[in-house]
Swiss-Prot record:
Recorded superkingdom: Eukaryota
Keyword vocabulary terms for this entry: Differentiation, Endoplasmic reticulum, Spermatogenesis
GO CC, alphabetical: cytoplasm; endoplasmic reticulum
Function text: Essential for male fertility, spermiogenesis and acrosome formation.
GO process terms (BP): acrosome assembly; protein folding; spermatid development
Keyword check for Signal: no
Cellular localisation: Endoplasmic reticulum
Assembly, per entry: Interacts with the CCT chaperonin complex and actin.
Disulfide bonds: none
Matches recorded under InterPro entries: Phosducin-like_chap/apop_reg, Phosducin_thioredoxin-like_dom, Thioredoxin-like_sf
Protein's organism: Bos taurus (Bovine)
Protein name according to UniProt: Phosducin-like protein 2
Amino acid sequence: MQDPNEDTEWNEILRDFGILPPKEEPKDEIEEMVLRLQKEAMVKPYEKMTLAELKEAEDEFDDEDMKAIEIYREKRLQEWKALKKKQKFGELREISGNQYVNEVTNAEKDVWVIIHLYRSSIPLCLLVNQHLSLLARKFPETKFVKAIANSCIEHYHDNCLPTIFVYKNGQIEGKFIGIIECGGINLKLEELEWKLAEVGAIQTDLEENPKKAIVDVMVSSIRNTSIYGDSDSSNSDSEDTK
C-alpha cells in the first residue's frame, strides 16, 4: 500500500482534491526545545523553591525580587495552612461521653463529624470500627470518632448498635441505627463508604453503590425462581387435565 505521506506527484494530486489529508509536517525538535527553554526562563527561580530554600537564598535577590518573594511566600504559606487544615484528622479517635458536646456537637464550623456508638462485645461494632479506621485515613478532612454507647447515652439498648451519627455544624445530617441500617453483619468497607458519601460526609471515588450488584443478583434469582415455578405449575396443571 502506498504511503500517503510520501512525496509523489500522484499524492499531491490526491491532496489537492481532498482525497488524502494534508501531509504531516515533521516536528522541529530544535524549535520545540527553544520554546521549552523560553518558557522555563520566564519562571523565576524562587517559584521552584520551598519555604526553607527561600529563607536561605534571601541575600541573593534584589529589592524587586524580594517584594515578589514576599508575595509568593505568603501564597505558599496559605496553601500549606489550607492543606494542613484539610488533613488535620486522619484517624478514628476514641472519646468519652463527657467529650461528646465539644468533639461532636460543637465541632469546628463546616467540618463533617462521624461518630460511632459501639459496644466491644458486639462483632459488627468491631467490624464498623475497622472500616471507619480505614476511611478516616482515606478522608482526613472528615472527623471520625467512636465512643462506648453507655458513656454517651445511659441504658442505650444493644438492639440499636452499631449506631452511626453524622453531624455538621451541630446538626445530625444522617444516622444509621442497628444492624440492618448499618449494612448487615457482612458489611463491606465500600458499602459503608457509599452510605457516608450519600449523606455528604465524604467525597467518594466510587461510581455506584457496591450493594447494588448484590441486590441485582438477588432480584434476578427471585425472578428466575418465580418463572421456573410458574412453568412447573403450568406443566403440572397440564398433566392433571390429561
